[in-house]
Amino acid sequence: MPIIIDKDLPARKVLQKENIFVMTKERAETQDIRALKIAILNLMPTKQETEAQLLRLIGNTPLQLDVHLLHMESHFSRNVAQDHLMSFYKTFRDIENEKFDGLIITGAPVETLSFEEVDYWEELKRIMEYSKTNVTSTLHICWGAQAGLYYHYGVPKYPLKEKMFGVFEHEVCEQHVKLLQGFDELFFAPHSRHTEVRESDIREVTELTLLANSEEAGVHLVIGQEGRQVFALGHSEYSCDTLKQEYERDRDKGLNIDVPKNYFKHNNPDEKPLVRWRSHGNLLFSNWLNYYVYQETPYIL
């Protein structure tokens, strides 16, 4: 089923080439079913790439989604054209009196800072507090997951000696959880981060349930408030070449960066990446939308 996005959004052409069903607002308004209102708080500097990654996954479901892109009013984005933000994005102030079926909070390249040092932390806290009563379910990704775990439950993050960078095997910790419907007991997901949250801290919080963990990469999936809050420490939304682009960017800057683990064929960066997370990435997003958004949200928000 389709997702509703602005007809001029650049990601639209990318998605149409991949046979992701997108629809204009004009066409959607002639249908009798209600679209799910999904907000994406995009904290990434690579906004257009992140848009395409997330829309690709949430668009691969039998649901009609009305997508609203959000950016932080208290932060100036240097890596994206301001006319793109003005044309396609709203701020929290624009939507704070509305309710949403779902909210996605992305990662951000600020993890080496303490949460309180991030220039938009106060605004993000207001959004996370708002989500508790105005959003049916919120999916937090990578740093967004660390921020959510810290704000809602006081779970700290810890610096890593080396960047967690690559594609890692994970094991399902809890059976018969709707978010993991259709998951294999072992599955892969990319990680790209300099900090971690620890299993011991998660297990100390009775309101949280650890769903998937990795011996090498650590905590990946956590759920709270019976699905009103979902935390994904990895990047199941990543495209095939995202880790490759990150590696080449840092290498070209002269940074000390290792080749992403378990990613390139024969671990050779001159060969193509091996995608081993795509099916479970689609499952993660479709299960979240189906079981924790669509099945739980009221018809009238």
From Swiss-Prot:
Catalyzed reactions per annotation: L-homoserine + acetyl-CoA = O-acetyl-L-homoserine + CoA
Family: Belongs to the MetA family.
Enzyme class, first EC level, given as a word: transferase
Lineage, opening ranks: Bacteria, Bacillati, Bacillota, Bacilli, Bacillales
Key words of the record: Acyltransferase, Amino-acid biosynthesis, Cytoplasm, Methionine biosynthesis, Transferase
EC number(s) from the headed UniProt entry: 2.3.1.31
Role summary: Transfers an acetyl group from acetyl-CoA to L-homoserine, forming acetyl-L-homoserine.
Site (Important for acyl-CoA specificity): E111
Ranges that cross the membrane: none
Pathway(s) where this gene product acts: Amino-acid biosynthesis; L-methionine biosynthesis via de novo pathway; O-acetyl-L-homoserine from L-homoserine: step 1/1
Protein name (database record): Homoserine O-acetyltransferase
Compartments in which it is found: Cytoplasm
